[in-house]
Amino acid sequence: SIMVPYVGSHDVPRLTSRADTGTNDAFNQWAEDGLPGQPGDVSAYNAAMQAYGWLLTTPGAPLLYYGDEYGEYGGADPDNRHMYRNESSWSIMETQLFENISELGKLRSESIALQRGEYSTRLAMANLLVYNMTHEDQVMSVVLNRGAPTSVGGFESNDIVRFGESSMLDGTLSVEAHSVTVIELDADIVVAPIYGCTNSTATNFDASATEDDGSC
């Protein structure tokens, strides 16, 4: 059997509305009660990215309720069943969320560790969670940071950031605030060839060239 984890569904109010700290109408379901509107604060979308960052990097076959990929808002059933909105009506925050979830979903589809790896916690704090997804052919490390910028050590020179804006230097990851980061551990580093003349006796010899281009 395969687990099907999910964050949103037709049984609960939309996640961005539940995460919208500026209102208390997320569980309203009828117009006369006052229904949630589109969140105007980025914190709701940051929370959604944390949730779907977890969903797309942990075991199981992740399920996304339609519209959650861009952060559709809505209260309790039936207000959580809005028609899917065309991207031309999305806010900048909704567009950014969609792009990030799409990119992370693509990475999952290409990563055997994210699809079938075994979960193990590396670090767990109030606002920071670091865990590995380990498969015999690949290991991915995931950093979920719902707080301020921070840093996480213990990485190696050939560990590569595959998703997120955080950066790696000398084994230390500088973690952006409210971010999701995925690092491939012990990654195969592919160096692009530098074409040029590799004949040291030629007049156009290029000492930096790694592959001859036939111009000698």
Positions of the model-derived regions?
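Active-site and adjacent substrate-binding regions of carbohydrate-active enzymes
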Residues: 1-193
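Primarily marks secretory-pathway-exposed extracellular/lumenal segments that are disulfide-
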Residues: 189-216
